[in-house]
Amino acid sequence: FLQGCPWACPYCHNSAIIDPRIPGVVAWSALEDLLARRRGLLDGVVFSGGEATRQIALGAAMARVRELGFGVGLHTAGPYPRRLADLLGAGLVDWVGIDVKATLGNYEAVAGRSGAGERAWESLGIVLAHPEVDHEVRLTVYPDGPGDGFEVAARAREMGARIFALQQARDLGTPDGFAATRPGWDDQVRSLARDIETLDFDRFIFRGDS
């Protein structure tokens, strides 16, 4: 889990590491020691966050992990499209889980930053332009969200996404005041899941509240 993120999503479950200045950094040498002990037991390393692509040294870290014989995965929300393109173009990533949070017009309300939507959707296009890299496109929904989940999924499918996951937000680790549910919310999310299932993804994953 890499510290820091430029966005401020209300349902973020890793809000404790959004500030890159917090203590608790693990030395890279300690991570290499751990991987050396786990060789043959682990298939790969997933770089997550926060926002992993915020870290300038991410490419070098991925290259080192590959040298050690592990596969490389990446969780990203896509705020840095050019960095993402460089990582994929260099062949450093085997799998990407990319979060797409809303349609373009609703993005700022979710991510809390202007221009976030343009960057995220550009990043999705970059991921889908690399068919050699496995992907999972993810949408997290919550009661006070924009309610555009089907439109998000349909647009991702039009762009060529093969695997799509609908995730129901939980309140574990989220900022104070976040509400993960309301009366009838579970039924609404299940209905949305059924609608998205009609879009004919190669694989559709529903991560509900249980």
Task: Annotate each predicted stretch with a short phrase.
Residues P20-G24, G50-E51, G73-L74:
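Short, flexible loop segments at the rims of nucleotide/cofactor-binding pockets, characterized by
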Residues V189-S210:
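A C-terminal junction/extension of Radical SAM enzymes
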Residues E32-G44, T53-A180, G184:
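Conserved AdoMet/S-adenosylmethionine-binding subsite of the radical SAM
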Residues F1-V26:
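Canonical Radical SAM [4Fe-4S] cluster-binding loop centered on the CxxxCxxC motif
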